[in-house]
């Protein structure tokens, strides 16, 4: 079984925490490092959240703080979904885990340059860290095996009618990534919204128990609350975790190759991922776009990872 070496770039975030939990435990994934970016909340908060998750689950992977601001646009956060801390719901003990002193962008560049081209980048927040790394050291581009990202949509957005939050939070960074020539896999809203976590799913993970079962329950109960308050929904998707699912077994997710372009023009479509689903532009595809996911398989995978945190001694 081949292990996928990855750097997980995230902005924790409730679904980010689920992605961290899965990536750190599944035997197919070799989680080299976690890089943090501003997104769901400001960088000081997303960093603390990432460290808290790692400490609670005893994940001994280095954590690096990255870009505190988007490349150009004014910063936005998703406090309506993720709360004042960015990870409201769970109660963590006193934090002793610390971030590394190296900046996330430098870590990404140095790690890729020293690699054999076998590292996959998994950005599940705004693409600020990845884009700045690409601009600072273009020689990393051929070193990236693949980028598997959560962001965008070929249908409607969730932060504006046109744009999904991660892309809208830094469209210029997304433009850099989507024009980089690196192989891209995009888990957009059309796919991730299929992973609706219901009270039944929460109860299933609670029955498994352990620290990850408890954390999953606390995270998703809060998510269900904000999803109902904001959208009237009885469940909440775990967007970012789909990227980890794809890396573990891409057969669980159907993709379609498309040409994708990020709209960086000011106006109602700012931050939209324009996906040429029908191929009408005649441009070569640059992205595998997620279409459907086997949800039974996916929740089984989540349960497998949750179960992995139960101590047997």
Swiss-Prot record:
InterPro entries, per database record: I/U_nuclsd_hydro_CS (IPR015910), Inosine/uridine_hydrolase_dom (IPR001910), IUNH (IPR023186), Pyrim_hydro_RihB (IPR022977), Ribo_hydro-like (IPR036452)
Keyword Calcium: yes
Binding-site residues, substrate: 227, 239
CC cofactor: Ca(2+)
Active site: 11
Catalyzed reactions: a pyrimidine ribonucleoside + H2O = a pyrimidine nucleobase + D-ribose
GO molecular function, one term: calcium ion binding
Keyword Repressor: no
A cellular component annotation (GO) from this entry: cytosol
GO terms for biological process, alphabetical: purine nucleoside catabolic process; pyrimidine nucleobase metabolic process; pyrimidine ribonucleoside catabolic process
Cofactor: how and how many bound: Binds 1 Ca(2+) ion per monomer.
EC number assigned by the record: 3.2.2.8
UniProt keywords, alphabetically: Calcium, Glycosidase, Hydrolase, Metal-binding
Tree of life domain: Bacteria
UniProt-annotated binding residues for Ca(2+): 11, 16, 124, 240
Family according to the record: Belongs to the IUNH family. RihB subfamily.
Quaternary context: Homotetramer.
Function description: Hydrolyzes cytidine or uridine to ribose and cytosine or uracil, respectively. Has a clear preference for cytidine over uridine. Strictly specific for ribonucleosides.
Protein name, per record: Pyrimidine-specific ribonucleoside hydrolase RihB
Protein species of origin: Escherichia coli O17:K52:H18 (strain UMN026 / ExPEC)
């Amino acid at each position: 079984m081949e292990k996928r070496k990855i750097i997980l770039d995230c902005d924790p975030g409730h679904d980010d925490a689920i992605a961290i939990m899965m990536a750190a435990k599944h035997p197919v994934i070799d989680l080299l490092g976690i890089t943090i970016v501003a997104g769901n909340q400001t960088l000081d908060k997303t960093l603390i959240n990432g460290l808290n998750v790692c400490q609670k689950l005893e994940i001994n992977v280095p954590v690096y703080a990255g870009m505190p601001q988007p490349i150009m646009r004014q910063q936005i956060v998703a406090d309506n979904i993720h709360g004042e801390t960015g990870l409201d719901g769970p109660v963590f003990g006193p934090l002793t885990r610390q971030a590394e002193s190296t900046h996330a962008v430098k870590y990404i560049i140095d790690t890729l340059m020293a690699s054999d081209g076998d590292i996959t980048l998994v950005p599940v927040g705004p693409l600020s860290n990845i884009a700045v790394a690409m601009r600072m050291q273009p020689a990393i581009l051929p070193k990236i095996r693949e980028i598997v990202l959560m962001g965008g949509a070929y249908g409607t957005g969730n932060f504006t009618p046109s744009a999904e939050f991660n892309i809208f939070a830094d469209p210029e960074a997304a433009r850099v990534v989507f024009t980089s020539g690196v192989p891209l896999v995009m888990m957009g809203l059309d796919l991730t919204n299929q992973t609706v976590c219901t009270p039944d799913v929460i109860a299933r993970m609670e029955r498994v128990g352990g620290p990850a079962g408890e954390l999953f329950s606390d995270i998703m109960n809060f998510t269900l609350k904000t999803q109902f308050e904001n959208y009237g929904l009885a469940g909440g998707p775990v967007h970012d975790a789909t990227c980890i699912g794809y890396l573990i077994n891409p057969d669980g997710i159907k993709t379609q190759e498309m040409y994708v372009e990020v709209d960086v023009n000011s106006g109602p479509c700012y931050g939209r991922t324009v996906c040429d689903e029908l191929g009408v532009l005649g441009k070569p595809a640059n992205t595998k776009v997620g279409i459907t996911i086997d949800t039974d398989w996916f929740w089984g995978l989540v349960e497998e990872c949750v179960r992995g945190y139960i101590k047997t001694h």
